[in-house]
Amino acid sequence: MPRKGPVPKRDVLPDPIYNSKLVTRLINKIMIDGKKGKAQKILYTAFDIIRERTGKDPMEVFEQALKNVMPVLEVRARRVGGANYQVPVEVRPERRTTLGLRWLVNYARLRGEKTMEERLANEIMDAANNTGAAVKKREDTHKMAEANKAFAHYRW
């Protein structure tokens, strides 16, 4: 903990093409070893693929996908009298978007298509249609929270 109070959150700059901070955050999630140019190329190509296949604005598809992937509840481990309980808690809005972006990118990486552009485009389109691995992760997270509802009174 710093002595001078809470450290202010750094704000990201909106990306040059779509003028969106969400897109910048997605680019940062895709980026490996500081190669931002490569990450941008991957995302913009993926967006072109989405535009080509759906005929819709890729930003709308992406926002819908993110909305379908963002979790509302999650479980957190809480130690009570020598036992660990999985306590369901509500996810804060900032963490909600962070988890949504992280899951989209991680599950896109695990897909079988040849290039990352195709994987990302397909994962985003699947998520927009409420299918795909990232949406399944959200459903599993909600199921876990629902199953452990009995421990909700241990919230902190």
Curated annotation (Swiss-Prot):
Any GO MF annotation of the entry: structural constituent of ribosome
One Pfam assignment: Ribosomal_S7
Disulphide connectivity of cysteines: none
A Gene Ontology cellular-component term: small ribosomal subunit
Alphabetized InterPro entries for the sequence: Ribosomal_uS7, Ribosomal_uS7_bac/org-type, Ribosomal_uS7_CS, Ribosomal_uS7_dom, Ribosomal_uS7_dom_sf
Keywords: Ribonucleoprotein, Ribosomal protein, RNA-binding, rRNA-binding, tRNA-binding
GO BP term (any one): translation
Function according to Swiss-Prot or TrEMBL: One of the primary rRNA binding proteins, it binds directly to 16S rRNA where it nucleates assembly of the head domain of the 30S subunit. Is located at the subunit interface close to the decoding center, probably blocks exit of the E-site tRNA.
HAMAP family per UniProt: Ribosomal_uS7_B
PANTHER family given in the database record: RIBOSOMAL PROTEIN S7
Subunit and interaction comment: Part of the 30S ribosomal subunit. Contacts proteins S9 and S11.
Family: Belongs to the universal ribosomal protein uS7 family.
Protein name: Small ribosomal subunit protein uS7
Protein encoded by which gene: rpsG
